[in-house]
Amino acid sequence: MRKKPIIIGVTGGSGSGKTSVSRAILANFPNAKIAMIEHDSYYKDQSHLTFEERVTTNYDHPLAFETDLLINHLKELIADRPVDIPIYDYTQHTRSEKSYRQEPQDVFIVEGILVLEDQRLRDLMDIKLFVDTDDDIRIIRRIKRDMQERGRSLDSIIEQYTRVVKPMYHQFIEPTKRYADIVVPEGVSNLVAIDLINTKVASILNETH
């Protein structure tokens, strides 16, 4: 019977560098069966709303996510069964009709701004990380990403940041730092922290697989 996969939770504010940290872990284990699952894929379907209504979505609130589905999918993967993960369309502000098949792996990195907010999700994790990065750096990264990758205007990004992103960070995201096993200041540039994390993952892999 297949051993239980290692589940690593990686969180932090938008633009903190959590995706880069996740990729650094992935890159360190090229021969392992390892995959990343993004909480963003589980934003709720909003096809029943008008586009104007969808644009006002608060993406930084726990209720924006269908976390129950993510939890169910992780339980299926733990049970060695594949799942179909939804794909979110940021240009239309709703879930795409497409999905992708995720096969069971030895390691899953579950990444997103609120992956430590739900205790049921935390309870499935073996290692929990919080990537802690200065607010100014995070907003600059968010502006670059949303303009280049999501077709957003500068004005809309700044308006959303001041109205939603910053207050939600302090209300919901930053408080989850207390649940982290490791807090990673400076993100992927913190080579000592990345090395410690990779050493721990390797140790668990050697013990259980």
Curated annotation (Swiss-Prot):
Q: Which domain of life is it from?
A: Bacteria
UniProt GO cellular component terms: cytoplasm
Reaction(s) the record says it catalyses: uridine + ATP = UMP + ADP + H(+); cytidine + ATP = CMP + ADP + H(+)
Do you know which Pfam families this protein is assigned to?
PRK
What GO molecular functions are on record for this protein? ATP binding; cytidine kinase activity; uridine kinase activity
Q: In which pathway does it act?
A: Pyrimidine metabolism; CTP biosynthesis via salvage pathway; CTP from cytidine: step 1/3; Pyrimidine metabolism; UMP biosynthesis via salvage pathway; UMP from uridine: step 1/1
> What's a single GO BP term from this record?
UMP salvage
Give the enzyme's EC designation: 2.7.1.48
- Which PANTHER family did the record assign? URIDINE KINASE
| Protein's UniProt name | Uridine kinase
Gene of this entry: udk
